Design a protein with these regions (language model features):
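Aromatic-lined substrate-binding rim segments of carbohydrate-active enzymes
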Residues: 67-131, 138-143, 147, 185-189, ...
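Gram-positive cell-envelope targeting signals
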Residues: 1-17
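A short acidic, helix-capping loop that chelates divalent metal ions and anchors anionic groups
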Residues: 91-95, 131-133, 168-170, 257-259
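Extracellular glycoside hydrolase catalytic/binding regions
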Residues: 33-34, 58, 63, 121, ...
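N-terminal carbohydrate-binding accessory modules
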Residues: 14-82, 98
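Short, histidine-centered active-site or binding-site loop motifs used for metal coordination
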Residues: 55, 89, 126-130, 164-166, ...
Length: 286
């Protein structure tokens, strides 16, 4: 055995900092490090890449789904290439509320490790919601993203989502000032990582970001929709922004209404997905 020969045993838990799988059959193996070019997510060869996958629910509430087999099923049986790790900040069990910070960070590290082993892309999502303005927990966010970007310094498959859904009147100027403090912290360790920035009104007002974009490279702006509620008006807003080469990432969507209730609206969902595919916009389903 390897142990008998004095080498390290092969069956050790993969270190989070190891480079992603470069097996050509995996999503990361095919595309490698991503960047943003002319409003599109692209790979090292300049090919447009569309990420598509699932978001977890709050990892504090459903940690059991952060496992290798779940992610492998999503990759192989559901044909996805991306997983979003949703870590609530202010809700019950949230990182900035009464949550166990070390346990939550370990869940994020585990999730990144499994995605890395599978050659999938993975989004670390600072999931603000009832903390409507990301500046409310800005110091915590800065410390978290500093630690995570150091932990994942060798993981080019990681994207960083710095504020899920600003809401309740939080302005783009407020979000922008927050991003201008948080992004440089990530850039210290990951100068080229793709960073996703939420937009006002539960990440619907991408037009506000288009009117006053951030100056950093490799930044995308998030649009969230729930197909039963959000229809032509929001689709038209997205199409206008996409035509003007705004880098947009749909980091969360659902087929029901925005409250999470109601039947799935397949007609509206189909229109949305057709639009996302037309402009090769990445998406994660909630």
């Amino acid at each position: 055995s390897s142990e008998a020969s004095g080498a390290q045993p092969a069956e050790t838990e993969p270190a989070v900092s190891e480079a992603p799988s470069v097996d050509d059959s995996t999503p990361y193996g095919q595309h490698g490090t991503l960047h943003v070019e002319n409003g599109k997510l692209t790979d090292a060869d300049g090919n447009i890449v569309q990420l598509y996958g699932m978001s977890t629910h709050g990892i504090a509430w459903f940690p059991q789904y952060i496992n290798y087999d779940s992610f492998r099923t999503l990759r192989d049986d559901w044909n996805t290439n991306c997983i979003r790790l949703a870590m609530y900040t202010a809700e019950y069990g949230g990182y900035c509320a009464d949550g166990d910070k070390e346990q939550l960070k370990q869940l994020v590290r585990d999730g990144v490790s499994y995605a890395t082993e599978l050659g999938m892309y993975v989004i670390v999502d600072w999931h603000i919601l009832s903390d409507c303005d990301p500046n409310q927990n800005k110091d915590e966010a800065i410390a978290f993203f500093r630690e995570m970007s150091e932990a994942f310094a060798d993981n080019d498959n990681v994207l960083y989502e710095i504020c899920n859904e600003p809401n309740s009147g939080t302005s783009w100027d407020s979000i922008k000032s927050y991003a201008e403090e948080v992004i440089p912290v990530i850039r210290e360790q990951k100068p080229d990582a793709v960073i996703l920035v939420g937009t006002p009104t539960w990440s619907q007002e991408i037009d506000k970001a288009a009117a006053s974009p951030l100056t950093f490279d490799n930044v995308m702006y998030t649009l969230h929709f729930y197909a039963g509620t959000h229809k032509d008006d929001l689709r038209n807003r997205l199409e206008t922004c996409a035509q003007n080469n705004l880098p947009v990432f749909v980091s969360e969507f659902g087929m029901c209404d925005a409250s999470g209730n109601g039947a799935n609206d397949f007609d509206s969902t189909t229109k949305w997905l057709d639009l996302l595919n037309k402009y090769q916009i990445s998406f994660c389903c909630w």
